[in-house]
Amino acid sequence: MTGRTRVRTAVPFALSLALAGALLPGATLAQDEAPAPPHDQPGPAAERLLYNSFFVDRAPLDIEAENMDLYLFGLKTEAAQDLRGTEGIELNDAPATQVSLILNPAPAEREDELNPFSIKEIRQAMQNLVNREAIAQDIYQGAGEPQLTHVGPSDPDFLTIYDIDRGSGISYDPELARALIAEAMTAAGAELVDDKWQYEGRPVRLKLVGRVEDERRDIADLVRAELEAAGFTVAITYDQFAAALQKVYATDPAAFEWHIYTEGYVRSAPRRYDVGAVNAYIAPWLGEMPGWREEGYWQYENEELDALGKTLYRGEFESLEERNEIYRAMTQASLDESIRIWLATVDNSFPAVDTLEGMTNDLVGGPRNPWALREAYVPGSDDVRVGNQWIWTERTTYNPIGGFGDAYAADVWRNLTDPTIWNDAFTGIPVPFRANYEVETAGPEGTLEVPSDAVAWDVETKTWKPVPAGTTAVSKVTFDYSLFTDANWHHGQPITLADAVYNIAQGVDLAYDPEKARIETAVAVTSRPVLETFKGYRLTEDDRLEVYVDYWHFDDDHIGAYAEPAGFDMPWEVKAAMDDLVFEQRRAAYTATAASRFSVPWLSLVLERDAGLVDRTLRSLERDEFVPPGVFEFGDRSLVTPE
């Protein structure tokens, strides 16, 4: 079958912004109106980003006092309304937050206990027990919009599932919800005694975890009242970020540290054709559903959703129409399962001083995108001062393997490392950020021959081995990393292809090396379904990296984004030291669950203790002239020597 080829190159963002303005209906922005940077040197507009923590209730006072230039956490609705129109302050508005309830569906292990949320009909009844209109209009004072599925009204895929959303029949109907709950509880053997459910003579008690920092405290109170009216005994705890996440996401659901939690998700990029959110919020294979794919934990399982999710994620469809049908099927199944009860999309207001120039807001995340603070500056200052609700908490972990799972750390990390590809701030289509790429595909029905000198990482021999004769792939993406490799790391050493190659080998090892997979189970089991589609790699004479994948999409840029194998987040030497610390010395872990299971620290490079461990390991590896065996013998190329 004849394939197609497309070349994508990075465009200066000021130019792309101007072009976007020229193309949008009613837009007046012209190319010469794009903000002029304060200098003509390479790199970001400002010299430094200075981060500091400002509690959300005090943030309006602090930004009025010019203690910061930008607050990267959405203000409470009333505070935003009071601040709007204040001289010297601008509000950057975006539908950047989605709120939901996650239910614990694990069955009770003891015969004299009952978890109501292990019963599907009770989870479904929760859809009618929550008052989304009250949350959107009263709690968020009109700044929220009711949301029934993982797709909010501002998302492009809302049109894909519009009829499912509007035809679901879900509305606030507490009498119906209580009747459905009563029917299911009675069938399970529970009794209603003095308007309270009992099972085996004991009250049916639910543990509700509510976040205390924002409007989710009010949501928790609202949900508690509805649950109590339905006959449940509710024990509510109000936790801040770290304590809540530890209780919910780092424990076995069967331990019942929680039954229901008020989730909140921030968004950092629009998605024209979503694959990540629909899988993360619905399908258990990706590790974001109760059980979190951690070894030894009870797991929520759903083979149908996993099969649909992997099909969508791996591009195993032949048209836009087929893709949309899979997406719709997953959305409908998520409503049937009702593990997450979606509540609202919230318009956040991010205040900034009006002297902050050059900043870009995308359509869903506002200033939470990689262009915003790279382009932002305050005239006459080398610094941009960024405030957030938190900069560090007990659950904030700086490591690129199993950390950066919270918005606060991710907000910093986004400006410490350049992505190769990122979704366009306006269209939601992947575009080059710091790597150019060329896509060639024979999909959806054909295949390409993988060259005989292409290689794949072999976990058993710890070497790059030639791919077997006759290996084929659906698509080929050729990456030009010269915008990275023509520059240095912050410590002055050159960025090289060895940094990317180490990342590729490391990822495969984490997934398939039996001992490493035993230690970091969640990382291993969630990455294998994707790694299975990567067929081989080849370095060209001009240092481009060819990646061969069994993946197709009707939009070539999505093929490019899928095939991006590793990127350049930190020098390979640091990654090697971390691997040694985690897998050889066993003195740290990449993920929270592994750290808990093996009673070692969850590795975070901003903590003096952990940074010291990595530093000492680096020095030891340097003394021994250590080079990871086999990793840098790539085809007929030696990318690193001990010297």
Regions found by a protein language model. Name each.
Residues 388-472:
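N-terminal lobe/hinge region of extracytoplasmic solute-binding protein
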Residues 89-98, 102-108, 245-312, 401-402:
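Acidic-aromatic pocket-rim loops
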Residues 37-38, 50-109, 133, 138-139, ...:
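Extracellular/periplasmic solute-recognition and catalytic clefts
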Residues 31-47, 85, 116, 195-200, ...:
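Surface-exposed, Gly/Pro/Thr- and Asp/Glu-enriched linker/hinge segments
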Residues 124, 136-139, 235-245, 274-353, ...:
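Extracytoplasmic/peripheral linker and loop segments enriched in polar/acidic and small residues
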Residues 285, 349-394, 405-408, 641:
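Long beta-strand-rich cores associated with HINT superfamily self-processing modules
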Residues 146-191, 210-218, 318:
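Structural transition elements
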Residues 60-67, 113-125, 448-516, 547:
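Aromatic- and charge-enriched surface segment that lines or borders ligand/interaction sites
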